[in-house]
Regions:
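Intrinsic-disorder/low-complexity, polar/charged segments enriched in Ser/Thr/Lys/Arg/Asp/Glu/Gln
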Residues: 3-11, 50-52, 65, 77, ...
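Short strand-connecting beta-turns/loops that link adjacent beta-strands
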Residues: 15, 46-47, 75, 99-103
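Beta-strand/loop substructures that line and gate deep hydrophobic ligand-binding cavities in soluble
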Residues: 81-136
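Hydrophobic pocket/interface hotspot
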Residues: 19-23, 29, 53, 70, ...
């Protein structure tokens, strides 16, 4: 089985800074990102943002734990890479584009290699279901949170 990859893009009626700040507040991400069940911040960067985070996500077929390293380039970019966890490799990102007039285009992406064991559970139609579940929820969750004020 290959990598599970994909992106979801949404246009948000909120300024880029608000969208970035919500996505960068990793501590509170489980409140609006349904597949993310738990986070524990292990380290913070010089700005007080989460730098190293232990997460638990619902991947539909199994709870997946990962320790992720975050990097930030405000207001346009957030990246994370797995340092250790249940999948072989994981890279995720947010990209933000200022559309003007207080609107933002946000893109959420994932590229994960589930590895052999988890990969055996994610064959065929289950793979597409898991990818859609993991990707769709984050972008829509950010949109709802940012537009709520």
């Amino acid at each position: 089985m290959g990598n599970i990859r994909g992106e979801r893009t949404v246009d948000i009626d909120a300024p880029i800074e608000r969208c970035f700040d919500i996505a960068a507040d990793v501590d509170h991400a489980p409140e609006w990102q349904g597949s993310l069940k738990d986070v524990e911040v292990l380290e913070r960067d010089g700005e007080g943002r989460a730098a190293l985070v232990e997460t638990e996500s619902d991947a539909k077929v199994k709870a997946v734990r990962a320790t992720l390293r975050f990097t930030y380039a405000p207001p346009g970019q957030i990246d994370w890479h797995q340092e250790r966890g249940d999948v072989k490799s994981l890279h995720g990102w947010w990209r933000f584009e200022d559309l003007g007039e207080g609107r933002t285009r946000a893109t959420y992406g994932l590229d994960a290699d589930p590895g052999r064991m988890l990969g055996m559970l994610l064959r065929g139609p289950v793979e597409a279901t898991v990818r859609d579940f993991l990707l769709g929820n984050a972008a829509e969750g950010l949109k709802q949170r940012a537009e709520a004020g």
